[in-house]
Design a protein with these regions (language model features):
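N-terminal export leaders
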Residues: 1-9
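Acidic helix-start/capping segments at beta-turn-to-alpha-helix junctions
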Residues: 76-89
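Acidic/histidine-rich, surface-exposed loop or edge segments in extracytoplasmic proteins
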Residues: 38-51, 80-82
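Histidine-anchored nucleotide/phosphate-binding helix
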Residues: 57-71
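C-terminal motif of bacterial Sec signal peptides marking the signal peptidase cleavage site
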Residues: 17-20
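Bacterial signal peptide processing site
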Residues: 22-24
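A cross-taxonomic marker for long C-terminal extensions/tails that follow the last structured domain
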Residues: 92-153
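Short, glycine-rich nucleotide/cofactor-binding loops
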Residues: 48-60, 86-89
């Protein structure tokens, strides 16, 4: 048992030594490179598929908090609405004013055209200032594949 233990200790020591040397050939990152990595633009897609004004207000608050925390120049935000959530993008909805404020701040608020078609809605029914995507779920999946962070309040 003593020989086996000595062998395992030797293997572990070798593995640790090799791991410690793994970074020796890499150049150290300059202060500018480290700062650039830290200040990389954040990209966030927010899903809203509920008709509940409370959920919408939470999503809109999330977008505002991101902009305040990171700065509007440091973050791209898309808020994608589909399914029952699309109703809050209609003119005169309970959150219409908040949506206007949000789009004015630079957040892209996007309506799913598949849902609009299913609910027999057209662009004149919808709030001014919003955008449109053919499929909300496809937009969200595409953004996640591109490395965007995903939020669903």
């Amino acid at each position: 048992m003593g020989a086996r233990r000595a062998f395992l200790v030797a293997c572990t020591s070798l593995a640790l030594a090799a791991a410690g040397c793994a970074h020796m050939g890499e150049p150290a990152k300059s202060g500018a490179a480290m700062k650039s990595a830290q200040s990389a633009r954040q990209r966030v897609v927010i899903q809203v598929s509920d008709a509940d004004p409370g959920k919408w207000n939470l999503a809109l608050n999330n977008a505002r908090n991101l902009q305040q925390g990171v700065g509007t120049d440091g973050v791209d935000i898309e808020l994608v609405a589909y399914g029952p959530g699309i109703g809050m993008l209609k003119k005169g909805s309970a959150v219409a004013q908040r949506i206007d404020e949000t789009t004015m701040s630079g957040v892209k608020v996007l309506a799913c055209e598949n849902t609009m078609h299913a609910q027999k809605l057209s662009k004149p029914d919808m709030q001014d200032g919003i955008g449109y995507v053919p499929s909300g779920v496809v937009e969200i999946a595409r953004r996640q594949q591109q490395g965007w962070s995903y939020l669903r309040p």
